[in-house]
């Protein structure tokens, strides 16, 4: 499990969890391509932004998040392998849009009316266009 945390703004002795992620369970000793893929992307040598601990951990968190939700966006591999991880601001924008895309896709599954589905599909299309414009 991973989480993006920060100090509470009113009480410096408390920590606030902004986002959390629980990865899938993987059996130890049993070959698993998904586990191997996750571990390869989270390998220290493959992580790109090692400027400070915060950016390093955020890259770790968001790569794990993207791998857990890679069905949400067809070009997730391009995002994971791209060089946008060197730029903290760009990474934050991309990851925020990716989280919104995953949220909209989840809400689309539970939508009942066609009006809701159409609205969510428009939002999904917009998020995908933004992600594609951020890619290199």
Where are these regions (language model features)?
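Selected N-terminal structured segments and early membrane-anchoring regions
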Residues: 1-78
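Alpha-helical oligomerization segments
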Residues: 69, 77, 81-82, 88-136
